Amino acid sequence: MNGKKLYISDVTLRDGMHAIRHQYSLAQVQQIAGALDKAGVDSIEVAHGDGLQGSSFNYGFGAHSDIAWIEAAAEAVSQAKIATLLLPGIGTLHDLKAAYQAGARVVRVATHCSEADVAAQHIAFARELGMDTVGFLMMSHMISPQALAQQALKMESYGATCIYVVDSGGAMNMNDIRDRFRALKAVLKPETATGMHAHHNLSLGVANSIAAVEEGCDRIDASLAGMGAGAGNAPLEVFIAAADKLGWQHGTDLYALMNAADDLVRPLQDRPVRVDRETLALGYAGVYSSFLRHSEAAAERYGLSAVDILVELGKRRMVGGQEDMIVDVALDLLNRNK
């Protein structure tokens, strides 16, 4: 660590959207953003769970527009930067500009780990706007560390100044994380920062984040009470407690985060964010964490087991954006069971 301060990136108000089907009220966004700001996090990501313009039949409709959520969060903070997420093909340059005007100053441009080339235009435009521009390689477990590094290089060449390893399926262990950070560090410019976005489906969210920092990672994504897709993200308050024990500088108030997690965030969960039969299946099968609620709904509709649906999705190597295939898989399983 050599005494450097970690950049703490909170994702409660973006990844956490998945946990409550994108239904945060504006008052809740203000309350949570205000608490995170006071606790000293560096950035607070705000958007529909699937990024700008994610509100749709495919992903689920949000209670409010991204812009309304971003404006609400921006009003509530005085120190932290407001971040947002953009998936090229869902969000457009127009949406990014609107988010910037609403107060977002950091953007994470997210692609499937093997499709960095679709982000060129969006990354370049974000840099033109003067945003802190991050490349976000989702489902990083699905390709080799060396292949991931080549995709990271592409994002760097388009203008991203930080590249994230994103364990969207919560499917990786500490060795997987080390291998990927070593591969990235071997090819990226020394001034290009790196980040880690973990999911807790195998209960390794915090351990994987620690392994990333040990490999030189600069930014850590985490959320209050782990609020996020699947079994959630690395729980922010737990990661900070562990970082404290390791003597790492993080600049946040642990007790303020603990209070925000239990007083503000946990009560909002209509389905507990935890490792259980279904979320463990996500991590074990390497499935996109936000498929959880969609798969549970399909299982209920067709009288199937959500685990069976998730395992089949894993076998078919489905990735984010293929939510419409969940019903297809359910119908195939129904026919198979006849």
UniProtKB/Swiss-Prot annotation:
Substrate binds at R14, D15, S168, H197, Y288. The record marks R14 as: Transition state stabilizer. Mn(2+) binds at D15, H197, H199. It is an enzyme of class 4 (lyase). It comes from the Bacteria. PROSITE patterns: PYR_CT. GO terms for molecular function: 2-isopropylmalate synthase activity; 4-hydroxy-2-oxovalerate aldolase activity; manganese ion binding. GO terms for biological process: 3-phenylpropionate catabolic process; L-leucine biosynthetic process. Gene3D superfamilies: 1.10.8.60, Aldolase class I. Keywords: Aromatic hydrocarbons catabolism, Lyase, Manganese, Metal-binding. The active site is at H18 (proton acceptor). Its EC number is 4.1.3.39. Pathway: Aromatic compound metabolism; 3-phenylpropanoate degradation. The keyword Metal-binding applies. Residues 6-258 form the Pyruvate carboxyltransferase domain. Catalyzes the retro-aldol cleavage of 4-hydroxy-2-oxopentanoate to pyruvate and acetaldehyde. Is involved in the meta-cleavage pathway for the degradation of aromatic compounds. Interacts with MhpF. Belongs to the 4-hydroxy-2-oxovalerate aldolase family. This is 4-hydroxy-2-oxovalerate aldolase.
